[in-house]
């Protein structure tokens, strides 16, 4: 079964690349138009990311297999997830492949992880996150698990270290055993 990875138009798309590289499952990739634009601005050619995926669909392709709940998946991660996408999912709007696939994951009770990058949150964002969590989704703000750097000189910790630790937490929510956890680093 494939892991569905979607990216929307928030910054922080380096984490998307790391997730796809580290995922032990084949990846089905979907990007919003703005997600593609941000990726190209921050990381370079989007085609390089597409080459790492087993399948790639346009966000406008509502006939893609993942638009149906009958197609099994490992789960879905929206990384990064804009608060606009969060709001659409929270209120039942499935007008794109990303939001439709998210709704399929909720209704089929499959893992749906929304990695919200934007801060601070308004009351509307908090309520939307609550709605998605109540429906079975996992809200995981793009905040690295700093505790995984315990005992290290902060000057020696790189952005890549923090992003890798974050991705390991995401993958652990999908059933992948983490290389390190709090018990091994403390």
Language-model regions: role of each:
Residues 1-113, 117-186:
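A cross-family phosphate/adenosyl-ligand binding-site feature
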């Amino acid at each position: 079964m494939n892991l569905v990875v979607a990216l929307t138009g928030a910054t922080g798309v380096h984490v998307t690349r790391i997730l796809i590289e580290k995922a032990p499952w084949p990846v089905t990739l979907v990007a919003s138009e703005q997600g593609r634009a941000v990726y190209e601005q921050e990381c370079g050619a989007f085609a390089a990311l597409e080459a790492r995926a087993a399948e790639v669909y346009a966000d406008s392709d509502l006939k893609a297999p993942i638009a149906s709940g009958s197609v099994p998946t490992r789960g879905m991660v929206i990384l990064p997830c804009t608060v606009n996408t969060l709001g659409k999912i929270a209120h039942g709007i499935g007008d794109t492949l990303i939001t439709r696939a998210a709704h399929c994951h909720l209704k089929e009770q499959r893992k749906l992880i929304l990695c919200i990058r934007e801060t601070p949150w308004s009351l509307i964002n908090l309520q939307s996150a609550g709605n998605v969590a109540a429906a079975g989704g996992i809200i995981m703000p793009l905040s690295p698990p700093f505790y995984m750097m315990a005992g290290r000189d902060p000057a020696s910790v790189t952005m890549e270290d923090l992003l890798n630790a974050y991705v390991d937490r995401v993958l652990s929510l999908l059933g992948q055993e983490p290389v390190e956890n709090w018990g091994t680093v403390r």
